[in-house]
Amino acid sequence: MKNVPYLTTRKKTSNHMQLNILITGSNGQLGNEMRKILKGNDSFNTFYTDIEELDISNRNVVEEFIITNKIDYIINCAAYTAVDLAEDNIEIARTINHMAVENLGIAAHKAKAKVIHVSTDYVFDGTSCHPYSEEDSTNPQSVYGTTKLDGEKVLAKIIPNDHIIIRTAWLYSIYGKNFVKTMLNLGKTKDCLNVVTDQIGTPTYAGDLANAIYQIISSEKWIPGIYHFTNEGVCSWYDFTKTIHKIAGITNCIVQPISTEEYPSKAKRPAYSVLNKSKIKQIYGIKIPYWVDSLEKCINELNQDLK
């Protein structure tokens, strides 16, 4: 592990002390969006870490880092998200999605820090006929969903008043590998694509999720518990793909709807995973963009990067 420089002093900005923020998994989609939104913000002194800088599966290292650096907020963007691979790599998924979260919780408890932890719609079985609320029963159908739920539970047990869990779904951005970038590439290189039409949910632009997290840590209120966040609206993966191609101006690729049965995968996916976001909107006053608007913003940003 590389030595990350430890803090010696806190700066005072205006009438407030600078808050020390630790972001884990900072090289991923959400981590990169957090970098973008916090850049140049003097209210926060932010440590951006990934496994090379901070191995969150190592409890002693985590505790030393968080306590020594007087961390106020931990934003855990780290996760094992390879849903199908998790079925064959149970221990790796458990280590990152459960045990590492426990390590962060224990360290946060000792340092009196607060934790914002990102979770998933996969904690639900997908059999609902209405958008899932935070109080609805969980019933994960995959190793990924099970390990993420275990991470939620252990964090809430260790720091009941100092945790916020944000469940999200269908995350995409200009960074890393994700569905939007894959469909853009396939749309430009394939004549025909088959995409599942009977799995229903809502895409989430990582930039919008990062903004929601920023609003929470900037707020003077802290209401612990579970929250749901995706963009507004509902679609299938087929609808999502058609809209991606429409916005990008891809016209020479035929997108055909197929059923989940026609596209078998190792891990079971929720057939319906629309999340009810009323709680986060009411408590923190967060305005959530419609999914098509955010998708257009992301694709425009990708196009700018290509120029």
Tell me what each language-model feature is.
Residues 21-37:
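N-terminal Rossmann NAD(P)H-binding glycine-rich loop of SDR-like oxidoreductase domains
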Residues 29, 219-266, 307:
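Mid/C-terminal beta-alpha module of Rossmann-like enzyme folds, strongest
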Residues 45-62:
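Adenosine-cofactor binding site in Rossmann-like domains, unifying the SAM/SAH pocket
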Residues 59-96, 109:
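NAD(P)H-binding glycine-rich loop region in Rossmannoid oxidoreductase-like domains
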Residues 95, 99-103, 110, 123-124, ...:
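Catalytic helix-loop patch of NAD(P)-dependent Rossmann-fold dehydrogenases
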Residues 153-201, 207-208, 214:
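NAD(P)-dependent short-chain dehydrogenase/reductase
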Residues 174, 199-210, 229-247, 297:
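Substrate-binding strand-loop-helix patch
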Residues 236-242, 259-298, 302-307:
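Conserved C-terminal active-site "lid" loop/helix of NAD(P)H-dependent oxidoreductases
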